[in-house]
Amino acid sequence: MPGVSSNPSDLFELQLSRLGEEHFLVLLWAAMGEDRQVKYNITNLFDDLKHGGITRTKQTAVAIVESLRILCLIDVRDERNRKNIYITGFGAKALEKLITTGRFVKKNSAFLEELKQ
């Protein structure tokens, strides 16, 4: 394809440019959960996205998670009947880049905030 670079960093930048707020929030909340040593799962994510007015269906939350998993930005593990979300090294790099660009505004996870109290 003309005009397409084979440079891996160009691919990473292109992938980041296509991520939306919902992807950013999954990366953010997964990282926050890991920092607090709390398992953050798809059900928590769905509740947080619903609370934030981003989605009304669990199917959308699962699709968001699956897209990030395919890009190797998160891992999803079945643990005790839950699908827990873990940020990868690539995901941490993506999150850092998204935060520094200021494209998205940080929003609190209701689940993680509840645990803080």
How would you describe each model-predicted region?
Residues 1-2, 116-117:
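Short intrinsically disordered terminal tails
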Residues 2-37:
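Short alpha-helical segments that sit at the start of domains
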Residues 21-24, 62, 88-89:
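Non-catalytic, well-ordered alpha-helical scaffold segments
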Residues 36-49:
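Short acidic, hydrophobic short linear motifs in intrinsically disordered regions
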Residues 54-71:
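Short amphipathic alpha-helical interaction segments
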Residues 69-79:
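A short, conserved structural fragment
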Residues 81-88:
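Minor-groove-contacting beta-hairpin "wing" of winged helix-turn-helix DNA-binding domains
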Residues 90-116:
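Short, amphipathic alpha-helical interaction segments positioned at domain boundaries
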